[in-house]
Amino acid sequence: MSAQKVRGLYFNQFEIGMQITTQGRTITESDIVGFAGLSGDYNQIHTDKTYASKADFGKRVAHGLLVTSIVSGLAVQTGFMEGTVMAFREISQWKYSSPIFIGDTI
């Protein structure tokens, strides 16, 4: 199904295979530092360049929940939740399939 612009969808209006395109957003070092301060998650894999360079991914990785928060914001900006969402209650069966690094655009 092709990407489309939509406004205010209810759950029963979503279709299997439906795609909603968002703007891109590049992850910055400031995003990671700010999220660490906000969340209290100062894990070295996110915040310590030297430590992260020796870890599995070879460089600092964005927090999974930071990426989820940015994705949520991008989704809101499309308008598909406009006037139809009361609360974000569940993200079911989501996986982080690959790391997101500083400079990556999602």
Labelled PLM ranges:
Residues 90-106:
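Hydrophobic beta-sheet segments that form the core/acyl-binding groove
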